[in-house]
Amino acid sequence: MEKKLKSWQGWLLFCGAMAVVFVLGLVVSSLMERRAETVSVFNNKRVEITGIEARNEVFGENYPRQYETWKETAKTDFKSEFNGNEAVDVLEQRPEMVVLWAGYAFSKDYSTPRGHMHAIEDITHSLRTGAPMDDKSGPQPSTCWTCKSPDVPRMMEAIGVDSFYNNKWGAFGSEIVNPIGCADCHEPTNMKLHISRPALREAFARQGKDIDKATPQEMRSLVCAQCHVEYYFKGDGKYLTFPWDKGFSVEDMEAYYDEADFADYTHALSKARILKAQHPDYEISQMGIHAQRGVSCADCHMPYKSEGGMKFSDHHIQSPLAMIDRTCQVCHRESEETLRNNVYDRQRKANEIRGRLEQELAKAHIEAEFAWDKGATDVQMAEALKLIRQAQWRWDFGVASHGGAFHAPQEIQRILGHGLDKALQARLAISKVLAQHGYTADVPMPDISTKEKAQEYIGLDMEKERKAKGKFLKTIVPEWLEKARANGRLAKL
């Protein structure tokens, strides 16, 4: 005989079922409401955007939430133990770096990076770009604009990629006026993520990969990899190229450059042919546990937020340490203090090796110059210069990736450790050369305890540099902006 439910049990089951249905209804309603709001955003655009629209303010008319958070990249109020979003004079903090870059523009000026809204302002004010008074002068090619503005793909489309690269930096000052923004990463009609610059697409193609087959989650990192990577200016045309053909590691790229017999510059003191790393953030991040587990750049640097029932990516791109509750704690249950200290612990260890490497490498350059002055020959110095090149490449590769000590801490410590070893080997090789010329005492070291002293030692006339830059900023830049406004390159909203 079947057991019958008691009356109260039946009512309990009924009420429970109704509660489940009610909760599910709320969830579905919320999802439908959010979907409807998303559809409403696309169906009720205030302006139609077609082609490459470089003016970020125009996108802001249709996507105010994203635009308002993007404008927050102008803020400079966050500082962590080692980084932040304010411009800090790194050469002032680490004067040895002036010596490491002797003969290269970075010895004049190098600060920590600010947010995307400052991209045009910072490159224009940097002493590294010089003071070009016309379209044909100045130390840098127009390739230096490539990652600074959505005006770049617009110009590439207008005049061709090769023609864009094969010009002086000052040639497009009145055209490249909008800072990094919407069109750099988004299709204008549907806002899908896209690749707006050729170098990444070309690098994939050379490896036999089709970047158009990337998943949406992969694209949340690949749009960043258009710029946050290692690259170089290839040939006389200064064609921007990623050295990925042999792989992502520091050794793979070194082999690529060695095979091409490439150097960014010849060091003014040691005469070593130096490789200048850019910012291999993407490559190093791919060697870390987060990327290997499928976490994208945007997951941590552009976390989701909700406003008025609308979920969207926060376009205030910044360090995840500034918003641990919306980044790290989405997956990790530890306290903010614990998670922050986990990051700092990794950074401190890498920073310790970095400091030692910079000191030894600066001494190697100075000792190499001393050896040349004592009559050393090219043959005698060959091994030492090779070791200096290898040591500095590893130092720069580790340092230029600002988040590398967190993204892939073991790899960064390995790279810096190998760099330190090679710097010490270089100093030993130089001492043997000096011994051949009858010199066995310690090489006298100059006072490079401040940025100013180091710059004077390597022969820079900083007063002249700053004076020329000041004149450029007062005369040429206003002309660029006036012309840009007249041609409608800047928004009038």
Swiss-Prot record:
PROSITE patterns from the UniProt entry: MULTIHEME_CYTC
GO molecular function terms listed in the Swiss-Prot or TrEMBL record: calcium ion binding; heme binding; iron ion binding; nitrite reductase (cytochrome, ammonia-forming) activity
One of the protein's GO biological processes: anaerobic electron transport chain
Binding annotation for heme c 2: C182, C185, H186, H315
UniProt key word Iron: yes
Entry binding sites for heme: C144, C147, K148
Positions contributing to Ca(2+) binding: E230, Y231, K276, Q278
Pathway(s) where this gene product acts: Nitrogen metabolism; nitrate reduction (assimilation)
Broad enzyme group: oxidoreductase
Needed cofactors: Ca(2+); heme c
The enzyme's E.C. designation: 1.7.2.2
UniProt binding sites for substrate: Y231, H279
UniProt cross-references to CDD domains, sorted A to Z: NrfA-like
UniProt function note: Catalyzes the reduction of nitrite to ammonia, consuming six electrons in the process.
Name of the featured protein: Cytochrome c-552
